[in-house]
Amino acid sequence: MKNKIFLIGMPGCGKSTIGEIIAKELMLKFIDMDICIEEKTSKTISELFEQGEDYFRDIESETCKEIIKYDNVVIATGGGVVKKDINIETLKNNGLVIFIDRPVEKIISDIDVSRRPLLKNGKERIIGLYKERYDIYKKACHKIVVNGSTIDEVVGEIKKIIINN
């Protein structure tokens, strides 16, 4: 079993919720990268984005380098972590990267856009991001798991992947 599991995917695909459950069930530590960034900077993700997306992405890259030092951990990354090739390389070279692929219609029906700075323009923005990032997520991962059913089924599928790697 790999001792670092990185969950990637669109905002609202279930990375944090699923990651927490998997970590608990496999007795691993859980880290939400966005929370790490907020604690490190004493600012919310939205406040950081107000200083520009490039500014935020630089902090995200620094955080990527820092979190790979942890062992026996499940890490829910930020949805845009794959926008920088250096982050993809860092994640892929240091653990098992799983893309949680959730149908965009389900993301739209569930997501709270007020907490997601890049999604505040609503449905069209989410669809645009999905189209922009989908192939990048596929390239950035070792395994793809579709989150189109229940959380229990997705958790079970990811746990099998983790245990068999």
UniProtKB/Swiss-Prot annotation:
It holds the Pfam family SKI. Its EC number is 2.7.1.71. Substrate binds at D34, R57, G79, R133. Keywords: Amino-acid biosynthesis, Aromatic amino acid biosynthesis, ATP-binding, Cytoplasm, Kinase, Magnesium, Metal-binding, Nucleotide-binding, Transferase. Catalyzes the specific phosphorylation of the 3-hydroxyl group of shikimic acid using ATP as a cosubstrate. ATP binds at G12, C13, G14, K15, S16, T17, R116. Binds 1 Mg(2+) ion per subunit. GO terms for molecular function: ATP binding; magnesium ion binding; shikimate kinase activity. The keyword Cell membrane does not apply. Mg(2+) binds at S16. Belongs to the shikimate kinase family. It comes from Clostridium botulinum (strain Eklund 17B / Type B). Pathway: Metabolic intermediate biosynthesis; chorismate biosynthesis; chorismate from D-erythrose 4-phosphate and phosphoenolpyruvate: step 5/7. Monomer. CDD domains: SK (cd00464). Its main location: cytoplasm. Coiled coil: none annotated. It catalyses: shikimate + ATP = 3-phosphoshikimate + ADP + H(+). Its cofactor is Mg(2+). One of its GO terms (biological process) is chorismate biosynthetic process. This is Shikimate kinase. The gene is aroK. PANTHER family: SHIKIMATE KINASE, SHIKIMATE KINASE 1, CHLOROPLASTIC.
